[in-house]
């Protein structure tokens, strides 16, 4: 179909007249819809930024005020002897939220409660793990978060499907490359399988950032921006904990399998 001065001429030769005012109205409607999507995105990720700033300030104040005897304490630092216990909280909270929202309407109070529930494992991590390890995991998570959400928010609307295909292709290639590197190492098969599974979960969580950003841009009304912000924040914290889980997996398996081949 080609356009000629207000006329739309299909390939079969039929001429359809479209007044210029309707064309301008369609263009204005699309522009306003895109502006509204940007407003929702700004409110949502602005709220995520405030949550990150508040949580960082809370954890920094706690680590500064905590007694020196708490750091790497044998009873408090479960991340060395049984690190998986720390990660039970985010996993169960994600499962509970999914089950709750499938049978009940979305409730911001429930999400805020489970957001605060992530603070104890983060405190344990800050007290028991090396600060360089925590900072590197946080930077990796934020880089993946900003990359996926940036593509989703800045790309034109007509490339939504192409965005999804590109992001999923990149995630698949990244996962394949990491698995190839893992399989070529001289570790035990148990360690290789568990590590590959953890990498898969993390890659899925990273790709979820892109889908969440698309949902915020195209589907979330402005009055539900806070609810969307809490969901995005939960996925961000969950991914951070999964990245730390992978980084501490070697110590975990050494403790339980007592193998020197890892």
Swiss-Prot record:
GO CC term (a single one): membrane
Top-level taxon of origin: Viruses
Keyword check for Membrane: yes
A Pfam family that the UniProt record links to this protein: Bax1-I
Membrane topology: Multi-pass membrane protein
Membrane-crossing residue ranges in chain numbering: 46-66, 77-97, 108-128, 133-153, 163-183, 186-206, 226-246
Any coiled-coil regions, as ranges: none
Tagged with keyword Iron: no
Localization per Swiss-Prot or TrEMBL: Host membrane
Record key words, sorted: Host membrane, Membrane, Transmembrane, Transmembrane helix
Annotated signal peptide: none
Family to which this protein belongs: Belongs to the HHV-5 US12 protein family.
UniProt-recorded name of the protein: Membrane protein US15
Organism of provenance: Human cytomegalovirus (strain Merlin) (HHV-5)
Gene: US15
